Amino acid sequence: MAAFSQYPLSTGWSFKDSDDQSPEAWMPVPVVPSVAHQDLQANQKLKNPYIGFNELDARWVNDKSWTYRTVFQKPAVAAGSSIILAFDGLDTFATVKLDGSVILQSDNMFLAHRVDVTKALEAEGDHVLEIDFDCAMRRARELREKDTKHNWASFNGDPARMAVRKAQYHWGWDWGPLLSTAGIWREVRLEVYSAKISDLWTEVELASDHQTARVSAFTEVDAADSVDSYKASFLLSLHGKEVAREVATLKDKVAKVTFDVTQPSLWWPNGYGDPALYEISVSLEKEDCEIHSVSKKIGIRTAELIQQPDRHGKSFFFRINGVDVFCGGSCWIPADNLLPSITAERYRKWIELMVAGRQVMIRVWGGGCYEDDSFYQACDELGVLVWQDFMFGCGNYPTWPELLESIEKEANYNVRRLRHHPSIVVYVGNNEDYQVQESAGLVYDYEDKNPENWLKTDFPARYIYEKLLPSVVEKLSPKTVYHPGSPWGDGKITSDPTVGDMHQWNVWHGTQEKYQIFDTLGGRFNSEFGMEAFPHMSTIEYFVENEADKYPQSHVLDFHNKADGHERRIATYLVENLRTATDLETYVYLTQVVQAETMMFGYRGWRRQWGDERHCGGALLWQLNDCWPTISWAIVDYFLRPKPAFYAVARVLKPIAVGVRREHHDWSVTHAQPPKTSKYELWIASSLQKETVGTIELRFLSVNTGLDVRAPILRDNVKIVPNGTTNILEGVINHKAQPEPHVLAARLWVDGEVTARDVDWPQPFKYLDLSDRGLEVNKVSESGNEQKLLITAKKPVKCLVFEERDGIRVSDSAMDIVPGDGQTVTVTGLKAGDAPLKYKYLGQ
């Protein structure tokens, strides 16, 4: 009995323009997985589309069909074994031919395919595998033209994209280029076996006291013949040590065992405990010979989405292992427009950055793709909760029968693939499709509960989100929460702040409110909000080739910002808040200050609301990352270089954070006058699970002199409420008695150490003289590749930002420094002889 074997088909490929019939048309493919844009670049047929205006020069690629071909020899096959040709992903309209015969046709990028080629490979010698990838943009237009009755309402990209099960951002989005890829985007291989494990999954029940857990493990076997003589040997282990072992027989090609685990190690999100991962493995055996084995990492945990009526409306927050978790985090878009170029190492670096930024949840956005296994593995290992959208975004999707069938297969395949990951705590039906329904005035009668009726309306996609997808999740991953859409709340208008989740875009988009009042604009769970900022100069220098173009309003910089009204909106927030500048380096910095302040005001206020009976259950900023070097809402750019907002968010999400703010005074309205008085508030937010005692100080420091304008306030033995908010004090600033502009500087000590700071500034910054700050940055120690810098100032300093240099990490940046409160920053990665990091602050 031969064991399972596999043979990757990753090399030896060539490709060509499908319309070019000349023998010289074939070009070598360095490695598969790949897409045509990558392979054209490798053959010097296409310039890097991420530089300058090269995206425009790459548009011709979108309109072409491409053919890939390889020649291989039949592997050794034992008697009774089958040969399977396995494709993990084909992008998108693919016709697969083996030795000239069509063996597969696919029109869904998100599906894997398995084709039995045993008979086709009976002949010895060379075999030719050829894949024709038809032009997805053309096919999309043809499909749209066939369905004239459907209302193709959408935001972003060509509405025809909704006819195709392909990453929707490939049609261009308001943060990315229009690069429609084609190719073998995931692994292809030959598998040879008489029997193999086709699936391994678990169902976990954790006792309410967390003292015991029951792990039921299941395996499914793929075999041409009877499996009565096979057995499945299961092993559960933790950190390489055996926890339990059991052997089971197969019935209808499925085996099941149940393990009772005492004192289980639980999987926790980062900041709440160790994300303990058990390993479940199964070996398929016959006559004491191992035929095939599979193992997966799983977590023992519970995850609930708490939606209960309360005085604010209806709650929306996550409870993990019985602990309420404020989900501060980010939305995730694909990390590249050319998906096969993203390595497992790059995925892990992104998730490591999230954890370094104290973020606990990532939302996989519905216009991209179901991510690579390595993405979810990193989230499992590092304790990051995953909000997983299904791949529908910003549109009214059609529902003809063939498309629904393909969507159901897609959902089944991906939920099966992902269901063992403890990081995934919610599946969500779509991104903003209910907002499209509202915008276009499509029919949505929430009280009509008959799915067949929904298909007859002009919003038939409701059937996908409220019938098809939840049925798949219930069948395959019954303990994972399903939510129909983002945003969505009980069928109410999606901007309703009392229920469900909310995308709050009235800062930047919409009514373009002042970012200083962001916290008043939120809902029960703020799953999108953002502010644009330029990336660092090193990133700009990558995609802006000509020195003459390195100014804020250059055509190439404009071209690399795809957002609607981008320049005008950036300018609005700049001129309202800061003294403007025209040199590029300062302009870049100023946009980053605005983004950092916006994120701080939002997160700080919403985290405070967590303590008000879970008024706000979480905040997921738009967006963590970029898919190309660009100007966008990302807080970390394409090259993993954090913008100042990354650090601002990290400080607000500390286990214990202090907040201080004065009431907002709108200086931009007609006949605005300086306020005579301003109320202020001081509070502490804690995610710790036990009460803590600390000392808190509030100082009132002149912006102009750095001196106290009134006596500090000091409170000892302050009891800090666990997993909530502790309101410390309220007061009033009398601007007649204290006319000098001054900051409110708060410090919190716990166990004798400063654990948190916050500084509230008079707004807007443009009215302040921030020159001559007396700032000093001194190296106080050095050990190996680690340096410690002490930062002091004679007058309050706003947003001290360190240079982001590849391979170098700073423990903090975008900092406010006040007199009498020196702060230490650790720099990791600088070698002896390296130039010190440059820095910039407001008013410098």
Curated annotation (Swiss-Prot):
The active site is at 432 (proton donor). Keywords: Carbohydrate metabolism, Glycoprotein, Glycosidase, Hydrolase, Polysaccharide degradation. It catalyses: Hydrolysis of terminal, non-reducing beta-D-mannose residues in beta-D-mannosides. GO terms for molecular function: beta-mannosidase activity. PANTHER family: BETA-MANNOSIDASE. In contrast to clade A beta-mannosidases, which are likely secreted, clade B proteins appear to be intracellular. Exoglycosidase that cleaves the single beta-linked mannose residue from the non-reducing end of beta-mannosidic oligosaccharides of various complexity and length. Prefers mannobiose over mannotriose and has no activity against polymeric mannan. Is also severely restricted by galactosyl substitutions at the +1 subsite. This is Beta-mannosidase B. The lineage of its organism: Eukaryota, Fungi, Dikarya, Ascomycota, Pezizomycotina.
